[in-house]
Amino acid sequence: MSKQQKILFIDRDGTLIVEPPIDFQVDRLDKLKLEPFVIPSLLSLQDAGYRLVMVTNQDGLGTDSYPQEDFDAPHNMMMEIFESQGVKFDDVLICPHFEEDNCSCRKPKLGMVKEYLQGGKVDFQNSVVIGDRQTDLQLAENMAIRGIQYNPETMGWKQILKDLTVKARVAEVIRTTKETDIKVAVNLDEQGGNDISTGLGFFDHMLDQIATHGGFQMVCKVDGDLHIDDHHTIEDTALALGQALKEALGDKRGIGRFGFSLPMDECLAQCALDLSGRPYLKFDAKFSRDQVGDLSTEMVVHFFRSLTDTLACTLHLSSAGDNDHHIIESLFKAFGRTLRQAIKVEGTELPSSKGVL
């Protein structure tokens, strides 16, 4: 692992396997018992891009109080079970010392994970320590990453899986310039409750079309220099909306990525979208009027160009018809319907052979 990775540093006894309450040692095969739902949860976490590292204190391992051979048999069986089911640990880190030995490797000290911290391997924002003891949470704090305290009743493996993979896809962007003051907030997994106010009634309606047909919630508040014209208001709103959508999508793992829409009323609107990470716009629509309501028709293409710049998407968008109002509305509606397909979560894999979007 040369680049930074999302790593789960997982305790063994009491987290992966049941810790015997009598002597706290898994030193016989008949004492080996997996924690509930640990294997399917770890498999799903691997699919979500997490690497697995086991980090465990084993008091007095290799001494008369805990002979190495007593540890090896159940530990090796556990590892064989995990491997046979597709669960792969990149590393198994073991501290064999007693607490009174005052070693540098015993959790919550950093000795066992020193190589990961100094080698630039850890994605600090997304890596997690998982364990049942306070020392595991202290290790997480010392590593400057998140800690989750495992408890089979209140925070078992099903809950941990949900916590780490079902993240709220929300974002808020505030953009303030000399011309505009804008706040855009989106929630990609909620619908309805849109609150849009840009000072341009027709533009508000078009933004609502994107959110409604896109199947997500949008709040958009804009204070712009409309006493001059609508250029900065529309351009900066598009930039803020594209940025908010990109931030809410996160690493894009599990999304559909692509979308295609072909709505047909009296206008034929076509939209093809790829959340590719690369901005590109192909736009084809002609208008016979300079304005529709309070919206300059020349700003329609500029809106979508600005949006593709910050969303970093490839967008092909066209519409043909006789009524400018309907043409513009069909463009926004088609984009919304296409965006709905592209942002829909369909699994856990990243939809790219390159490993990044």
Swiss-Prot record:
In the N-terminal section; belongs to the histidinol-phosphatase family. In the C-terminal section; belongs to the imidazoleglycerol-phosphate dehydratase family. The keyword NAD does not apply. One of its GO terms (biological process) is L-histidine biosynthetic process. Its cofactor is Mg(2+); Zn(2+). Pathway: Amino-acid biosynthesis; L-histidine biosynthesis; L-histidine from 5-phospho-alpha-D-ribose 1-diphosphate: step 6/9; Amino-acid biosynthesis; L-histidine biosynthesis; L-histidine from 5-phospho-alpha-D-ribose 1-diphosphate: step 8/9. NCBIfam families: HAD-SF-IIIA, hisB_Nterm, Histidinol-ppas, PRK00951.2-1, PRK00951.2-4, PRK05446.1. The keyword Lyase applies. Pfam families: IGPD, PNK3P. GO terms for cellular component: cytoplasm. Zn(2+) binds at residues 95, 97, 103, 105. This is Histidine biosynthesis bifunctional protein HisB. Its main location: cytoplasm. It comes from Vibrio parahaemolyticus serotype O3:K6 (strain RIMD 2210633). GO terms for molecular function: histidinol-phosphatase activity; imidazoleglycerol-phosphate dehydratase activity; metal ion binding. It is found in: Cytoplasm. Mg(2+) binds at residues 11, 13, 132.
